[in-house]
Structures are given as C-alpha cells and as structure tokens.
Amino acid sequence: IKYTSPIYGGLQYELMYALGGVAGSVSSQDTISGAAAYTRGPLSVAAGYIFAKNDGAAGVGTADLTHNNSVTPLFGSVSFVGSRQIAHVAAQYVVGPFTANIRYSNAQWKPYIKLAAFNRTETFNTGGTSLQYLVTPALALNAGYVYTRSTGASSATYHTVAASTEYYLSKRTTLYAIGAYSHARGTTFNAAGTGIVSAAGSIGDLESSSSTPSQVAVILGITTKF
C-alpha cells in the first residue's frame, strides 16, 4: 500500500505499508517506510525511514532489508535479525560544475532470538560526504569518504575512501572506473552470531569482506539504459 504526494513548492513525500501475509496476525512480517524530498534552487535535501519485522529466521519471503539469507560484510548474522529500522538524511548542493553531498544514517538491528554474542540491539551510525566535478558534459570525477561505527555487543569502526570517474558515451551508455580503500578496527560477530571476531575491511555492497582489517577494490564497467 503506497501513497506518493504531489509536489508542493519543491516538497514531495511518500508513505508505504506492506502486509506480512501471516494468517491471524496483521503486524507479523510487515514493513513500514516513508520518505520526503525538498528541492529549492541548487539545494536538495531528503530523509527516509524504513522498519521491517521478522518473527523467525530470515529466508525467502521475509521482510529482510538485505538479500535473503545473505551475509553483509559489516554484520554476519543477518539470518538471525528480527526487527530492523533505518533512518537516513542527506543534502546536496550544486555550484557550477561542482556537486557536494553529505549524509547520515542510523540503523538498528534486533535479534529475534538471543544468541551468545548477538543478544541485543546493534546500532550502526554512518556519515559520509562526496564531491563531484564535471570536467566536461561527458566527463565526471568523483571522490568520497564514509565513516561507520557499530555499537552494542560489537564495537567496530570502518573508514572508506573512494574515487571514481564516469564518461558518458551517450544518453544511454556510460563507462566508469572506481577505486576504493577500506580499513576496519574493533570487533564484530561471526556468521553464526555466537562469537566475536576482529572486524574486517569492507567496501560498499561487495558482500565479500577481506580476511584482514583492510580491503582494496578496483572496478571497471559499462552501463546501458534501456
């Protein structure tokens, strides 16, 4: 069930509620979300919130904020997560060929059963900033930094820096190159949620953490829109 508002003087919002489909329970496995965006001249701001509830092990069809049954590099016990919520705010400002962004998010994951290590709410606070320079209408250069801190039974920090370039061959096709470096400190959970291990370097949504505190990634690609 979703409602998207008209645009009122640069402001637009959207509300969504998804039923869990569990017989005899209205709220079980449900998802609630909302978002708003405002644009005025070179300034754009946005905020969003999502809450998803699982009453059992995450699997196909559950209200899972990640891929079903997958392991996120920052947190290995996805299948044991019950309710989770994420709040996010961001702002963007454009000056000539430059576009600057800043953002912050707070994510809270609660276990549906208490494990030896993952036995209470885990909170991830993330802040980031990025800058884009449009060299020509066809060439863009980007740089960014992201900081994440986890608290709860785990205690880890993650620093990630990245640089990229995009070349627009046409309105449909873009070539891109990305280089990134991540470094982690502290401790997090193992995949079973039963023990504490050293945090590993993790870049974006690669879904493959390093076996050491640091990770480097270089990505070359092409995108085509249809």
PLM features per residue range, with description:
Residues 9-10, 138, 171-172:
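Short loop/turn motifs that connect adjacent beta-strands in outer-membrane beta-barrel proteins
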Residues 37-167, 178-181, 213, 224:
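Detector for outer-membrane/organellar transmembrane beta-barrel domains
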Residues 12, 44, 219:
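A residue-level signal for beta-strand positions that form part of recognition/binding surfaces
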Residues 22, 41-43, 65, 170-173, ...:
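Short, surface-exposed, polar/charged, turn-prone segments marking secondary-structure boundaries
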Residues 171-219, 225:
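Predominantly the C-terminal beta-signal and adjacent terminal strand-loop region
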Residues 31, 64, 192-194:
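Short alpha-helix boundary/capping motifs
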Residues 1-39:
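Aromatic- and glycine-enriched pocket-lining scaffold segments that form the walls
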